[in-house]
Curated annotation (Swiss-Prot):
Molecular-function GO terms, alphabetical: 4 iron, 4 sulfur cluster binding; ATP binding; metal ion binding; oxidoreductase activity, acting on iron-sulfur proteins as donors; oxidoreductase activity, acting on the CH-CH group of donors, iron-sulfur protein as acceptor
Species, as recorded: Cereibacter sphaeroides (strain ATCC 17029 / ATH 2.4.9)
Protein name (record): Light-independent protochlorophyllide reductase subunit B
EC code(s) of this entry: 1.3.7.7
Superkingdom, taxonomy of origin: Bacteria
Binding residue positions for [4Fe-4S] cluster: D36
Annotated NCBIfam families: DPOR_BchB (TIGR01278)
Length: 534
């Protein structure tokens, strides 16, 4: 564990909370101090759930550590059962309570409650949130699911969706419609929306559809071995992946690979004349491995972007992430340190970032367009509208979401042609984003002076004054070690397209520092350009 201002994943017990909150008839008793009781905030404020999560806490305090914390936990279990009457109970410890080393599973079993008790042993100091959700769902399946006779009609289970997941609610509906269009029934969706009784009948399905490997793959592998149910390997995000998914499901179910794509608009929108400005846009992707790998395929193959960087924060999926990155000629960035991600983005200077809530903050700071493709996300990415990521409608949503932050093609030409215009200048940003118009900056005093008619003496020198001869206002004595841009160099820098201007500025300043220069002139800018072009 480490101290940080931001984390992509919480501790494992947060993953267990996501599983319990997504289910019905399940209650989670968490051995935790008062400081770990933040489930209500996560699910009611961020996800906007209309009811409190089914989580009870022991809420022990410092003074309780000298007494019997085991009795405190048993009282919490007993009270939770009597008050909520769940069909099953999950028990476990938070990262802080793990240090006490109370046997929560044994203590709960000693109560002889009349409902199944699922024991969770989540290593808080080695693993994180997605592992916690994956392991919790696996233990629930092991405790409750059993082999049974298959349904008469071909059916499947949808595995992996949880509470606080990125668009899980809408993905379930979209994939269900896709499967029903193929004549395949959905036996159960788990853990989100499932009760312990639904988990018990998972074995009735003919196969499983794994929607989110981060939170459902362990259960899918267990079901394949124990319940003899194969599971899908393709995540249907994007047009190509959805068609591959349909073919894979058809092979497992023994049906024709047909799907209704009448609502699909993304391919034509991507190929239409007003979308040609997408081609070649440099994009950086970061998030959970499943969404990043799928989004990279959509970005390159379906929208014509150039993928210049990709990575994930969940180390459990480092191997498939690195394998996918090789297909793009890249080395994957696998880290849970947002500062490393920001450093990579600065070095690559992409034109679009596809990431999490953290990448949205980074993009805002760097002035780069951004769209969110993966958890963790904030409240605005739990929309009231229907907005899936999967299936054909999900492909439409991806197009709209990713294109919206970009400057339109015609507007890019206007920025190039009228760079100093009062309306179409670089600082204004894309006009379709609303807000208020940003007026162009007033010319500086030295720039205004240069615009005045030249005197005879100036004409004799070729009509220009070298910056070194008459230093501009901002080129006055700079603090020691600080690099200052001269007017002519600053003006030339503005002629560089805005999406690579930041990188050009950084490279030039690095070049100047290496050469021991404190003032960057036009010549310095050209020398730096030649240096990095080698």
């Amino acid at each position: 564990m480490k101290l940080t201002l931001w984390t992509y994943e919480g501790p494992p017990h947060v993953g267990a909370m996501r599983v319990a909150t997504g289910m019905t008839g399940m209650h989670y008793v968490l051995h935790a101090p008062q400081g770990d009781t933040y489930a209500d905030l996560l699910f009611t404020m961020i996800e906007r759930r209309g009811k409190r999560p089914p989580v009870s806490y022991t809420t022990f305090q410092a003074r309780d550590l000298g007494s019997d914390t085991a009795e405190l936990f048993q009282s919490a279990c007993r009270d939770a059962y009597e008050r909520f009457q769940p069909q099953a109970i999950m028990v476990g410890s938070s990262c802080t309570a793990e240090l006490i080393q109370d046997d929560t599973g044994g203590l709960a079993d000693a109560l002889s409650l009349p409902v199944p008790v699922v024991h969770l042993e989540l290593p808080s100091y080695q693993r994180k949130e997605n592992f916690g959700a994956d392991e919790s769902f696996l233990q629930i399946c092991r405790k409750l699911a059993r082999p049974m006779e298959r349904t008469e009609k071909v059916s499947c289970n949808l595995l992996g969706p949880t509470a606080l997941g990125f668009r899980h609610r809408d993905d379930i509906l979209e994939v269900t419609r896709l499967l029903e269009g193929m004549g395949i029934a959905v036996n159960a969706v788990a853990p989100m929306g499932a009760s312990p009784a639904d988990i018990a009948r998972l074995g009735a399905a003919h196969f499983n559809v794994l929607l989110y490997p981060e939170t459902g793959e362990s259960a899918a592998r267990w079901a394949e071995k124990t319940l003899k149910q194969p599971y899908t390997k393709t995540v249907p995000i994007g047009v190509g992946a959805t068609r591959d998914f349909v073919a894979e499901v058809a092979a497992l179910a023994g049906v024709a690979p047909v799907a209704d794509d009448s609502r699909l608009r993304q391919p034509w929108w991507s190929a239409s004349v007003d979308s040609t400005y997408l081609t070649g846009k440099r994009v950086f992707l970061f998030g959970d491995a499943t969404h990043v790998i799928a989004a990279a395929r959509v970005a390159r193959d379906e929208m014509g972007f150039e993928v210049v960087g990709m990575g994930c924060y969940n180390r459990e999926f480092a191997r498939p992430m690195r394998a996918a990155a090789k297909g793009y000629g890249l080395e994957a960035l696998v880290t849970d340190d947002y500062l490393e991600v920001e450093e990579a983005i600065q070095a690559l200077a992409p034109e679009l970032i596809l990431g999490t809530q953290m990448e949205r903050h980074i993009a805002k700071r760097l002035g780069i367009p951004c769209a969110v493709i993966s958890a963790p996300v904030h409240v605005q990415d739990f929309p009231a509208r229907y907005s899936p990521q999967m299936g054909f409608e999900g492909a439409n949503v991806l197009f709209d979401t990713w294109i919206h932050p970009l400057t339109m093609g015609l507007e890019e030409h206007l920025l190039t042609m009228f760079r100093e215009d009062f309306e179409f200048h670089d600082e204004a940003g894309p006009s379709h984003h609303g807000g208020k118009a940003v007026p162009a900056s007033a010319p500086r005093a030295d720039e205004a002076a240069e615009a005045l008619p030249l005197t005879g003496a100036e004409t004799a020198e070729g009509g220009s004054i070298p910056p070194e001869a008459v230093p501009p206002a901002e080129a006055a004595e700079a603090p020691a070690g600080e690099i200052v841009w001269l007017t002519d160099a600053e003006r030339e820098l503005k002629k560089i397209p805005f999406f690579v201007r930041g990188k050009a500025r950084r490279n030039t300043e690095k070049f100047a520092a290496e050469k021991g220069l404190t003032r960057i002139s036009l010549e310095t800018l050209y020398e730096a350009k030649a240096h990095y072009a080698r």
